[in-house]
């Protein structure tokens, strides 16, 4: 394990402990948006939302890959599969199906906001697996959903994050073209080892989709040619 993965694991572990055991603060920033729709104000919580949005504009979806406790658990599940079956390549979803499913989370995002407005309830919070994990809005349904997606992540890496997470959809809007981007350079020999390790099933050697990337840097850590760099967006390709 290289230094960046060690740092990421430390970050994920600390944020997991903080959000799950040390705070009653609503972790899901999507919940803050729902609260704004219902009450017209979120008080000091708006500062937390602004920080995450600004961080995403600068670095991309770093929250998803470094801070989210749910993503941390899903990652543990697919890596457990890799260890048990001694696989080097992550399982993939049919490309045509995958390319359609990635838009499903935007449907979840819009539907959740519409239902929140018209039903005057925290629509997504009622079923959100994070709610159960952090003991905030946990329901039987959210427990079932948590167990389902933990199980699914054993077979489809980061399935919830890829296809269903409204917070991921929200942050994707701000990470279409972040200031710092992950890019391939002229060292790339198209071996696709980076793609074999990408939990989001991104076609890195063809076009690295910044809004889908959760900044886990598994691709960069796996590259033997140092063909991936995380640099300022307007820096010329080397």
Curated annotation (Swiss-Prot):
It is a multi-pass membrane protein. [4Fe-4S] cluster 2 binds at residues 198, 213, 216, 219. Keywords: 4Fe-4S, Cell membrane, Electron transport, Iron, Iron-sulfur, Membrane, Metal-binding, Repeat, Transmembrane, Transmembrane helix, Transport. Signal peptide: none annotated. Residues 178-208, 204-233 form the 4Fe-4S ferredoxin-type domain. The keyword Transferase does not apply. GO terms for molecular function: 4 iron, 4 sulfur cluster binding; metal ion binding; oxidoreductase activity. It is found in: Cell membrane. The chain crosses the membrane at residues 13-33, 40-60, 107-127, 140-160. PROSITE patterns: 4FE4S_FER_1 (PS00198), 4FE4S_FER_2 (PS51379). [4Fe-4S] cluster 1 binds at residues 188, 191, 194, 223. GO terms for cellular component: plasma membrane. Its main location: membrane. PANTHER family: FERREDOXIN-TYPE PROTEIN NAPH. This is Uncharacterized protein MJ0750.
